[in-house]
């Protein structure tokens, strides 16, 4: 027999199909009345409002310009950030100037066009960086196999690849993630980020997932010159990527547990200078536990970098991050710790901590972040309007290779306002 709540959802679904502004107002009034009568909880009402808004938006964006286009969905993200960071270099009074600045972190607008026979395309542009975040064509062959071709991130690193920038709980990604995946500057490895290539994705009902990719070896943005670029001897060998994961629901559907590993082999992308015949291998293992209001996440990175430390010395940079959160109502305290050992290659504060000054080149970097998230509109899964703030502190130490004692520290405040749609 149907419950009252089931009937309510069915009624709201019927109203939703009508898709007019007047009906949307009626929906809101009806939901408010059901909350007052105790038929719906505040959280259930919030979820229903979000679902109705999403479905109404999707129906408005559907078009019949061609009978082969089934749906066109528009999405977007605005992130406005303020940061105040103070850097202190041991043994000198000539410290870098304090960073005290506000800026637009991301301004993204995306379009997904879905066609008949499970073909689709996705374009996501970031006006903040004047570059594409994704641009690819997708074909779903069956519930198990999906093929993507174009421009997107390489499948390496849980925090980097699987957790959207809009869902980061500590505002920015960890120092070790940034050191491993962001562009090679002679210190960072460049073992991730955006690539041109082909991705093959798979999944089965048991929770097992896998993903394989073949891409150009170098990380790139998409500009007008990329459409005619032919490559060079230093980057004409493909890079190979793989990720295998497993996700399981916990008892009584109170949470989930996810674990997996990722791997990347990048020919000619190792060493201090790209294209010199030195190869780079990166990998990670990760776990993500969500139980009720609590979450615990972590990841370990490792690498083999030919001539990564110097012209005569390889390096095996490694590190980890771990983060815990606890959701209470609309608020979510966050604590995260990360550590990076460059193994003689070198790392600066700014290589791992966004917006920080360099502080000099050292061998190891440690970071702590203490903060909180306020989900103003939406919840942890939807986060349409979110305010984040926190205190962070970091320390880089020791001279690479020689191990001579040296140190630089940074600490300060970071906040970000975000709107997703």
Go through each PLM region and give its residues.
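Active-site-proximal beta-alpha loop/turn segments in soluble metabolic enzymes
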Residues: 213-232, 266
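Interfacial loop-to-helix transition and helix-capping segments at the boundaries
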Residues: 231-237, 278-280
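N-terminal periplasmic/intermembrane-space "pro-region" immediately following the signal or transit peptide
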Residues: 2, 10-15, 19-79, 88, ...
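Short secondary-structure boundary/hinge segments and terminal tails
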Residues: 51-53, 131, 157, 306
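Glycine-/small-residue-rich active-site loops that bind phosphorylated ligands and cofactors
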Residues: 40, 129, 368
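Outer membrane beta-barrel
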Residues: 62-220, 236-252, 320-345
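Outer-membrane beta-barrel pore domains
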Residues: 86, 95-96, 135-140, 168, ...
